[in-house]
Each structure stands twice: as C-alpha cells, then as structure tokens.
C-alpha cells in the first residue's frame, strides 16, 4: 500500500512539475525543457530524501502542490482577462491553503517568498493571495491551540 501511494504521488508530482515548467518557460522547445525540468524537480536531493525515507506523507504532498502554486501565480500575471486572473488566483489561494494545513512553517516561508516576488514583479495580487492562503489554513492552528490548552 505504501509503495502504491509513493508511485501515485510521484506520477502526480511529475505532472504538476511539468505543468509548472511549461508555464515558466517561453521557448520554442518548451516541451523538451519542461520534461527535463520536471525530472530535475523529482531528482532534487531533499525530494529524493523525503520520498525514499518516507519522512512524512505531508511533505510528499507539499512537494506535489508547490508546482501548482507556482504555475498559478505565473499564469495569473501573464493573462489579461479578469476571469482567468481570478481563477488562477483562487487556485493559488487553494494551493497555499493546502500547504498551510499540511505544514505551517512551509506556508509562512512561501508567504514570504510570494510577497517578495510580488514586490519584485510589481504584482499587488501576490501578497493578497499569500495572506488569503495562510488565512485559509489558520483555523487548523487555532483548533490545535485550543486542544493543547
């Protein structure tokens, strides 16, 4: 059962990483570079450590959701139509909310990076998306604090 979970998550992670690199690259041969980028993403040392040592399933899921967050932010800043901007923004909020529910430190780190990226790219939507995503995960931590005390 454990190996089936790992194989399934790695297939999905490959798909999300390929999609992320496909959104990031603006070259003629972006399919080839997306394939190489996705394989590189799967072979990052910490990713390999998380998968092979089965540190925590939540860490495996975070590695699966981060490319969705990155692709959503890039597509949102590239598109002109408000309908698509809203859809990509909501996808990014949902992805960051999922990451926040899995690991609060990772969500706060990504919130910081999203805010810095928004300042550098002059995209006011980025900090708003980051704050909404972290706020979506906030009730999880409030409930855990109530149960502790």
State what each model feature region is.
Residues 1-149:
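Membrane-embedded transmembrane-helix bundle of lipid-linked glycan/lipid transferases
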